[in-house]
Amino acid sequence: MDHVRNFYDTILRSSHPLLMAFHLAGKAAPLAFYIAGFLFPSFTALFITIVLLLAADFYFTKNISGRRLVQLRWWYDSSATSTETFTFESHKQYTAGPPINPIDSKLFWWSMYLTPAIWFVLGILAILRLKLITFILIAVATCMTGWNTYGFRCCDRWNPNNSQSTEPFFQLPSIPGLDNITRLARFQSFFQSAAN
């Protein structure tokens, strides 16, 4: 019982205790629903509930709690005109800003790194138990929490004064435009018409 009281006191020492509570609840809720999955009448209802909770946590962490607790914000730019895939906003850009509370930072980063690790362990257990449909749910959860963690990690290590530090170590491939596919189709139809 002392652990619960100490944890409660730690959250109260946060600069945003309500926001911190929602952040931690957003990480714990999908895990709790997964563990209590036997209470659901069907796996489909459980799957949809967990994916919706994960999506809400992804949005809340990325746009609200990350911005307020550690003063970081990131987004992925999928436009073909941009050479940089990630765009970052950080407290490092602004000289006179409020300091980051160490309790906020510690709880934020622990929850960000611990959540994908827990989902990964649950994924290994699902594979060992040969529950492949359950593994799909866990893979979605691991990808969503891991992608958010990766974005915040890159944002935290980003240096606004160094333009080369914006390149993440993992680059998603760019999808070519449809004009290349139409050129290929015209080229192929040229040879088909010549053969006839």
Swiss-Prot record:
Kindly give the InterPro entries that the UniProt entry links to this protein: TVP23-like
The SS bond pairs are none
Q: Where in the cell is it found?
A: Golgi apparatus membrane
User: Which residue spans traverse the membrane?
Assistant: 18-36, 43-60, 107-127, 132-152
What keywords is this UniProt entry annotated with? Glycoprotein, Golgi apparatus, Membrane, Transmembrane, Transmembrane helix
Please indicate if the UniProt record lists Cytoplasm as a keyword: no
List of glycosylated residues: 63, 161, 180
Report one GO cellular component. Golgi membrane
- GO terms classed as biological process: protein secretion; vesicle-mediated transport
Lipid bilayer topology: Multi-pass membrane protein
A Pfam family assignment: DUF846
Q: State the function annotated in the UniProt record.
A: Golgi membrane protein involved in vesicular trafficking.
What family is it from?
Belongs to the TVP23 family.
State the name under which the record lists this protein: Golgi apparatus membrane protein TVP23
Q: Which organism is it from?
A: Candida glabrata (strain ATCC 2001 / BCRC 20586 / JCM 3761 / NBRC 0622 / NRRL Y-65 / CBS 138)
